Each structure stands twice: as structure tokens, then as C-alpha cells.
Amino acid sequence: MIRLKSSALQTTRLLGATCICVLLPPLTAAPIRQHPDNPRWLEWRGKAVALITSAEHYGTVLNPDFDFRRYLEALQRDGMNYTRLFAGSYVEPQGAFGIERNTLAPARRKFLAPWARSDQPGYAGGGNKFDLDRFSPEYLARLKEFIAEAGRRGIVVELTFFCSTYGDQQWALHPFNSTNNIQAVAVPSWKSLHTLPARQPVLFNYQLALTRHLVRELNGFDNLFFEVQNEPWADNHAMGDFINPYLSDKYSFPNAVEVTSPESVAWQRAIAKAITDEEGRLPQRHLIAQNVANFRFSLNDGDLVPEAGIIHFHYAYPEAAEWNRGLNRVIGYDETGFAGNKDETYRRQAWNFVMSGGGLFNNLDYSFTTGHEDGTDTANKAPGGGSPALRRQLKTIGDFLHRFDLARLQPDPLFVARAPGVVVRALSHPGKAHALYVQGRGPTTLSLQLAKGRWTAEWISVEDGHVLKRENISAEKAPAALASPEFNDAVALSIVRQ
């Protein structure tokens, strides 16, 4: 560990001068990025990719009791290609949000933060207080080991630097709480932690220092992108919209669409600028994600961090992708939940979102817990779902999308002229291929604006990916009629020119 001489700003300079040559991972291929031919999808290791996963509650590194190798083995086995991770600037108490077994709530004295422990007792979660002028080598080693192991297994990692505080229980455990660090940095209100102009400039310098430190140390990983903050609207929001106008209490969750306040957006822009500034002196450039709102909202420039290539919604509706297509960024559904625990609920959400043009889907999977890192704790009480069966069903979506030339696929709402009894979402590579998701009462007969020629159509089970029906089509003029097989609730359809 390296002792800093004065401010947190010096942290970045000192660590940059002394540690970068030792701790950086070996340089690999270019990091995951927006696809150069279609910025609404991603490109990784030379291929267009959609990130689709059902992953744990972001505590794999900060919770040292969690066996992350077993966890990554389960993700790889189930065909998941992505996981989300909190950097350790936020931790939860046991029982938070009604989660019985929470990977983001480590046992007492076990919280592994990015800062070193001091020699002074008194951290509210057990053990010594944090020294915000020193970074923890144990944390950094575990973080790098996790990202490297994920990369070997073909899994992309989203690292979220900061998180809203939500309430006094979380604040009691927060490393930035003056009672939990030896610097005793004064914080007038935890709600102002992630806002500009900074009400606590010293603390803002520590936030910048952590950001720059992790950006430097992780620069060599290709399976990594950064997210500035989780759910910034939770602590600082403006009312954006509501979902159902017929509810009497339309301005409460889960009907209210809360968007991030301008003061919080300004803070996120400052953190994003620190990321790009730091990487401007380093070999690699990593994508930045911005978490903007829950549910759905049409965004404008004032809502956005200019450096962000990925825009995240939580509990998202398909309209989140549809309404923001013109931004030319990847639109992600970054967290599910609060809709029960049935697999079919989150399977439907995933299909509807990605088939509306969303490039990323992350089901928050509560079946991953300490001791059940294989994702089999389906009895865990939590505000969401997750199971091995759901992960297999989500793999079917990825397999379906990646059978096409993904970078050429675009939402095509006019391709389906008529769809009795069902709702259809279509992605098209015009003149070459069409991918459809059909949900509703089957069987049905679709009327399609299919170009003249010979085509192969395959109706595919959304549960396990097997082909329900295959036929050759000779299209003479549009619209062409195509009859489905019997199906229960939903079916996928691939149409490819012969």
C-alpha cells in the first residue's frame, strides 16, 4: 500500500507514477465498443454482440465470501455473456430492499472496499475505519482476478463506480460517512453525494481519485466497460412521466418515471470527463454507460453525458429503446425486478426489449447467493426472480440474435402488415433476413412485407430454441401470408433469403 502525502488528488498522481507498470494487466485486444457499422449494437473480439444475461446482485468482488469462480463457471455454462459489478463505494445492510440473501450485503467485518483499512476501530459494518488516502491492494487483486477470469470465459464486465445511497441504513455503512473513515470528511447530506456544484469539494476529490485509480489499473482489459452511477434518480430526481394515467396515485413507484436531476447529471459528466481524461494518457479506451431513468423516457441532450455510448434504463419498457433510437447509442435494460419471480415474466421482458432494438439486457438474478454461487438458490426471498431455467431461456435469445448478421439488423415496425391476435416485434436486414418475436394468442397467420424471392422460414421455441416448423417460401408479391404453428404465449421467427 502507498501512503498519500496530502489530498486525494495526489492519490491519482502517486499511484500513477509508481504502480501502473506493476499492476496493469497485459494489453489484449481492443475493448468492447459500439459497433462501427451500427452504434446501437456492440462489437467485441471482432464480432457484433448483444449482451444478454441473468446475473447476481453486483457484490462478487466486495463480498469476499462469494466464490466468484464458481459463479463465472455457472454463467458460462448457462450461456450468459455479461455481468455487472459495483466498485465498492456503496454496500448494503442485511435485509435491504427485502432481499433475504444479498450478495451486496457481506457479513460483518467482511466488506472489501477499494480503500485500505486504517488502524483505528469503528467502522459501522465491523472492523477498522477506512483510510481514504490509501487504496487496498487486496481489493484490487480480487477485482483484477475477477475481470480476468470473466474474460477467459467470454464474459463482459460492467463496473459501476458509484451508487445512490437510498436511505439512512445504507448511509450508516457508507465509506464516505464521516464516522467510517479517518479523514472524517464532512457530508452535509448523503443526497448531495453525487451532485454538482459539489457541497463537499474534498469528498468530490476522493470520488475523482477512486475513478482515476480504477480506470488506470484496469486499462488493459478488453472485456470491460464503465458505468458512472447506479440509479442516480433515486437520490436526486425530477418527475419525468407516468405509465398509467388512470391510477389515482400515478406519481409513485412503480408508475412514476423518475429522471435524473440536472445537478446529478452535471456530476456524472464530471466523472465521465475524468474517465476519458485518464484514458487519454493510456493505451485503451473503454465504453462509458449512463444510467438515466426507470421504465421509459424520451431523452434530450440535457439528460445525457456526452461521453456515454451506452444508455441504461431499469425496469424498462420496449419504448425505452424505441423512443431513443435516434441517439445512436446502445440502449440497455440494466436491471429487472419488482415484477414477481416467475421466469416467463423476465423472459418476455428480455425478448420484447432486445427485439425493439435494445442492445443489452441484464436480469437481476437472486438465485446467486453466497454458498449458492451456481445460481440454484431459487428459494431466496427477493423483489425479483432468477433460476437456471430462466438463464437457459435467455440463452435462447442470444442464440437467436447471433444467428443473423447482427450489425445489419434494424427495427422494422412496417415489415408486419397484419398480425391477428398477436403483437410482433421485428428486426430486419432488408432484402436479406428478418427476425421476429411474436407474442399473444396462437396460432396466427402473419401478413409480411416480404421482398420477392425464395426464403427459408423457421418458427423457434422461445423456451429452448428448438425449431417448431420449417418451410420454404416463394414470395411473389407483398404482403405474403405465413401461418404459424401452435404455440403457447410466444414464438420466434427467422426468415432468411435462400
Where are these regions (language model features)?
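Active-site mouth of glycoside hydrolases
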Residues: 36-39, 43-307
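Bacterial N-terminal signal peptides that target proteins for export
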Residues: 2-19
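Aromatic- and carboxylate-lined catalytic core of secreted/periplasmic carbohydrate-active enzymes
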Residues: 346-472, 483-498
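Catalytic-core region of carbohydrate-active enzymes that cleave or remodel glycosidic bonds
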Residues: 302-373
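N-terminal signal peptide c-region/cleavage motif recognized by signal peptidases
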Residues: 24-25
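Short, hydrophobic beta-strand segments that form beta-sheet elements in well-ordered domains
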Residues: 287-293, 310-314, 331-332, 436-437
